[in-house]
């Protein structure tokens, strides 16, 4: 079942985990000095590091799946919507960030209290805490973690690596919960084996992230983000070059799209619409 993790992939994975853990430990003492050091890196973070960290955060596990899905259902034109993030971040950086820094606050909730004060501020903080902390973050984490599980499923085969009785105990647990966490869904004959394997993969991912975030604070997060964006950018470029090479070049790629979607793709989209940079054509 699934694919095998190559030696190079294993080295990259192990090296990054070791780096992330070491970054958390390295920045632990500095981050533990006070809240500003922990949450804001002492307000000394260079702009380029902050920018790369934001880019890495936007480029999550779900990003390739999302972009591919948008192109398949709405065409290249559908990607224009992502310009809103560029405009928003420029607005934040050049218009609002200065005022936030002068306010001397540490968190968004504190800014709300300083800006409004009194009972209205308390109500607003409560609403924002529930909406952003529970609804928005819950939805965001759900799709990112599910995307991570879909990507990890063919490669992280815990059922082949762990002792049988130990892994079976995890299978029994997820079976009792009854919530499938697999690409195939409930109809897959190995649904609970794959769900158990994906559950262990997510535990490992969350454990590493929680460790370096909790110990290193913002400095630890940014340091790992910079390495992540470098790996993702290089990997994406290498994958794109490989795909174009395999189909015979950019011209052949266009021909393959017309051949594959001659009678329409998802939702009836036509080849010309998939390749369109403007609505319709």
Model segments located where?
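Membrane-helix interface/capping residues of multi-pass secondary transporters
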Residues: 35, 76, 217-218, 226
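Transmembrane helix-loop junctions in multipass membrane proteins, especially transporters and channels
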Residues: 25-33, 97-106, 158, 218, ...
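Helix-loop-helix module between adjacent transmembrane segments
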Residues: 20, 79-214, 275-281
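Loop-to-helix junctions at membrane interfaces in multi-pass transport proteins
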Residues: 2-5, 40-49, 66-81, 113, ...
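Membrane-embedded alpha-helical segments of transport systems
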Residues: 54-63, 71, 84-92, 131-140, ...
């Amino acid at each position: 079942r699934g694919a095998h993790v190559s030696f190079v992939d294993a080295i990259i994975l192990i090296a990054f985990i070791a780096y992330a853990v070491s970054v958390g430990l390295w920045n632990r003492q500095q981050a533990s000095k006070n809240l500003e050091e922990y949450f804001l890196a002492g307000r000394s973070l260079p702009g380029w590091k902050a920018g790369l960290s934001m880019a890495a955060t936007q480029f999550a596990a779900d990003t390739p799946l999302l972009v591919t899905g948008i192109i398949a259902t709405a065409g290249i034109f559908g990607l224009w919507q992502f310009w809103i993030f560029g405009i928003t971040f420029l607005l934040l950086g050049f218009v609002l960030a200065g005022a936030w820094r002068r306010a001397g606050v540490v968190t968004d909730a504190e800014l709300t209290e300083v800006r409004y004060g009194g009972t209205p501020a308390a109500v607003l903080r409560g609403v924002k805490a529930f909406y952003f902390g529970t609804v928005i973050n819950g939805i965001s984490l759900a799709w990112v973690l599910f995307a991570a599980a879909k990507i990890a499923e063919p490669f992280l085969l815990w059922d082949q690596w762990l002792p049988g009785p130990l892994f079976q105990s995890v299978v029994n647990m997820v079976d009792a919960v009854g919530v499938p966490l697999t690409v195939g869904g409930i109809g897959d004959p190995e649904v609970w084996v794959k769900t158990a394997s994906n559950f262990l993969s997510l535990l490992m991912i969350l454990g590493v992230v929680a460790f370096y975030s909790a110990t290193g604070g913002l400095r630890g997060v940014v340091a790992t983000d910079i390495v992540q964006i470098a790996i993702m950018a290089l990997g994406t470029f290498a994958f794109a070059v490989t795909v174009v090479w395999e189909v015979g070049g950019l011209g052949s790629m266009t021909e393959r799209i017309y051949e594959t979607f001659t009678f329409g793709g998802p939702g009836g989209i036509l080849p010309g619409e998939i390749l369109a940079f403007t609505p319709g054509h």
